[in-house]
């Protein structure tokens, strides 16, 4: 994921060294991004190399802290339009794969979690992968 710049809505207790966004992309199965409480939460990936064509993505949540009412949004530098596709993750610990009906092209990709399975609105992600 070195070809993307990542921003997130929040980090638990602002503890970037423990729960920062970079931990979604490392190979360590014990590290994660953990949001602060409150809804909505989001993860934004911005391509460093211009437009990208995305066909699918994978997310591994921590059970009990998964997204609900989720949307994958795509913005292009060539258009003001935002493509928004809902996706429906299960509240489990395993890596979940989501294929798009039609591949989308853009330079900014946003995973929006309108609500969470956690009562306080927290999201915990161990792994996030976008596939071209």
Predicted feature locations:
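Trp- and acidic/polar-enriched beta-sheet ligand-binding modules for extracellular glycan
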Residues: 3, 13, 36-41, 64-132
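Disordered, acidic Ser/Thr/Pro-rich linker "stalks" and the adjacent N-terminal cap
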Residues: 1-49, 60-62
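Extended extracellular/luminal ectodomain segments enriched in beta-structured repeat modules
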Residues: 40, 49-56, 106-107
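A short beta-strand element within beta-rich, extracytoplasmic domains
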Residues: 52-64, 111
């Amino acid at each position: 994921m070195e070809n993307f710049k990542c921003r997130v809505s929040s980090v638990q207790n602002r503890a970037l060294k423990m729960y920062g966004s970079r931990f979604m992309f490392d190979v360590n199965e014990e590290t994660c991004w953990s949001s602060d409480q409150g809804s909505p939460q989001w993860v934004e990936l911005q391509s460093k190399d211009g437009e990208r064509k995305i066909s699918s993505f994978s997310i591994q949540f921590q059970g009990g802290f998964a997204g609900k009412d989720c949307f994958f949004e795509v913005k292009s530098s060539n258009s003001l339009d935002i493509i928004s596709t809902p996706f429906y993750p299960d509240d489990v610990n395993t890596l979940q794969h989501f294929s798009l009906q039609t591949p989308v092209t853009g330079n900014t990709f946003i995973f929006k979690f309108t609500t969470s399975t956690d009562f306080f609105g927290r999201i915990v992600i161990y792994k996030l992968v976008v596939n071209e």
